[in-house]
Amino acid sequence: MDTILETDKLSKRFGDFEAVSGLNLRVRKGSICAFLGQNGAGKTTTLRMLLGMMRPSQGSGHILGLRIDDEAESVRIRERVAFVAEDKRLYDYMTVRQILRFTKSFFPGWRTDRESDLLRRLDLPLGCKIRKLSKGMRTKLALLLAFARGSEFFILDEPTEGLDPVATEMVLQIVVSLASDGATVFFSSHQIAEVEQIADHILMIHKGKLVLDSPLERIKDEYRQVQAVIHCPVQNCDFELDGVERVYVDGSTVSMIVSHNVDAVMDRAYKMNAVSVEVAPLTLKEIFLETVKASG
């Protein structure tokens, strides 16, 4: 399986605080990979290290075969990777038309056809000064400047922030079309529903550590809530099984979050004379919240 991004024990410390701890990330070529985590989990710090904008304290990484911790190679990474930062910084004194002309001059592979299509779909005013654009319009412009570069790899930090629902849906469709054309997209987001709609792989970090790394379909197929009603003393029940992530007890009811091995968990419940055992799927949001809780 070809990878476009990989890291080995990537870490970043700020004094005594370890913001990112030993990350081993892999992003497959042609995938849409979501990078999830709470505020302060280390997502933006990780993205900055990947792009050579911040040096790691330990560990290493490669994008497109180039070392992220080598100054010269990190410049080449930034030339080849289309990046949209969370703050969407742009040259406020320029008009939309001027920044388009300015940006395309740096990229020989600029997709003029995609630029024209996105200008129409995103309804950007060419003659307007950037400083007069709304937050949503600035986000649209930043995305257009990235999407039209003709890159094979896109790194997007909160790409739909500030967009209304119609514009959000349009941007998600564009991201899917990029992947359909052979590009790879690695994006961070707080919008779980959006992630569930377009991502095919999930990388989740919590307090700087990788806590989940799996294809989305496998997560949705295997994660379950198992609820058993057991009339024997619940405190004597042993559900320390492979795949049981969390156990909640409420009277005679035992609820478990199970990442895999559901059949074995059900068998254990029946061996404890459970009078009923129910299995229900979990949404990605529920899995995210439970993974965060389990990680402490």
Residue ranges and their predicted role:
Residues 51:
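Helix-to-loop junction immediately C-terminal to a conserved catalytic motif
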Residues 225-296:
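Short, charged/small-residue-rich alpha-helical element at the C-terminal edge
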Residues 59-70, 76-77:
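Conserved ABC transporter NBD signature motif
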Residues 170-257:
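ABC transporter nucleotide-binding domain
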Residues 79, 85-142:
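ABC-family P-loop ATPase nucleotide-binding domains
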Residues 154-158, 163:
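Catalytic Walker B motif of ABC-type/P-loop ATPase nucleotide-binding domains
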Residues 37-42:
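Walker A (P-loop) phosphate-binding loop of ABC-type ATPase nucleotide-binding domains
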